[in-house]
Structure formats: C-alpha cells, structure tokens
Amino acid sequence: MVDLDGAKSGSRVNAAIVKEVAEQSGMRIEMGGGIRSMEDLQAVDAMGVWRMVIGSAAVTDPNFVKEAVRVYGDRIAVGCDALNGEVKTAGWVEGSGLDYVDFAKQMESFGVKTLIFTDIATDGMLSGPSFAALERLQKAVSCQIVASGGVSNNEDIRKLKEMGLYGAIIGKAYYAGTIDLAQAVADGGSQDNP
C-alpha cells in the first residue's frame, strides 16, 4: 500500500483504512508514503503494518534509515526509485545525483534487507520491468529485491522468479486485466503470513 495522502500532507489521514485492512485481511501489509521520522514509523506500526517502506527520506536523511533498521530490523524496506539510473525523490520530480546501485549499496551497508526498485520509465506502462537494471542491482547487493514498475503479465512474473528476485509489485496490470493474479502467486510464490 502507498499512502499518497500521507506522502503529500505528512499526516496519516488514511490510518483507519490501513488499520482495517491490516486487521481484516490476514495478510502482511507493506506500506510507504510520507514516512520521514521515527514518529511516522511508530504511527504506521500502530496501524498493524508489517513492513514499512522509507522512500525519499532514505536519500535526504540516511541516519534515519540507520535508526529505523536498528529499531525495526527487517521490517524496514527502502524504496529505490530511479530514472535513467538516477535516484529520484519527492514524488519522482527531484534528482538526487545518486546512481541507483551506489544508493542500494549504501542502504545495504546500513543493514537494509529489502529494496523496492522502481524504474520510473516503466511504471504504469505495462511494458515489462527493466530486467537489465534489476539484474545489475541484483549482482551488486545481497538485499531482497522487489521489482516495481512495468510488470504487465504472467510471463514477467515467471522471468523475475527465474532471475531470483524476492518479489514483484503488481499494479496497473491487475486493474487493466492483463495478469492472472492467482497464477502470478502460483508462479512467483508467496511469503508466508505470520
């Protein structure tokens, strides 16, 4: 889940909805959007969210990531959103000057175990993930890598699985009906719920 309102406003306006989904779904909920401080993490944790995704703040405040990992361990993931290899922040509009692989290595050195990689150029395009960029990232770090952006069909899921990626985020493909979700779970596998 991404709390777009929280990302914009810096407040948890969707807290009740997120908490309800966490309580009633029986699934591990992963959420990002506007997580900028330890207080934000505490609030998101209180909603029942299992994995908390730090995005732009990982670039602007690396010490926050260190503290988050110290307190929450592998429940912290970092979003790595890149365009032409450069990490972008602030809703993908600000350049950071950081190469996505160098950024991933830095996050790994802080103890981050899960990276969510979005190639901005493919997000929402149903054109397939950026397999080459994902392969480069996978060779550079030992983190669990989740592919986000461009996943368009079940063949993409099978290829990501063959590459050894930890997971994939399916968005537009589900809403557009270009992927069979049950088959995607069967092909890609799933992490066990607690």
What role is predicted for each listed range?
Residues 12-19, 62, 93-102, 127-136:
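Charged helix-capping and loop-helix junction motifs
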Residues 17, 25, 29-50, 132-167:
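Catalytic cores of alpha/beta
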Residues 35, 42-64, 119-121, 149-153, ...:
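Glycine-rich phosphate-binding active-site loops on the catalytic face of alpha/beta enzymes
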Residues 42-45, 49-123:
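Conserved anion-binding
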Residues 1-14, 56, 116-127:
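Glycine-rich, proline-tolerant flexible connector loops at the mouths of alpha/beta enzymes
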Residues 21, 44, 68, 106-107, ...:
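Generic structural signal for hydrophobic
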Residues 84-95, 125-128, 135-136, 144-148, ...:
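Active-site-adjacent loop and "lid" segments of alpha/beta metabolic enzymes
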Residues 1, 29-33, 52-54, 76-80, ...:
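Hydrophobic faces of well-ordered beta-strands that scaffold small-molecule active sites
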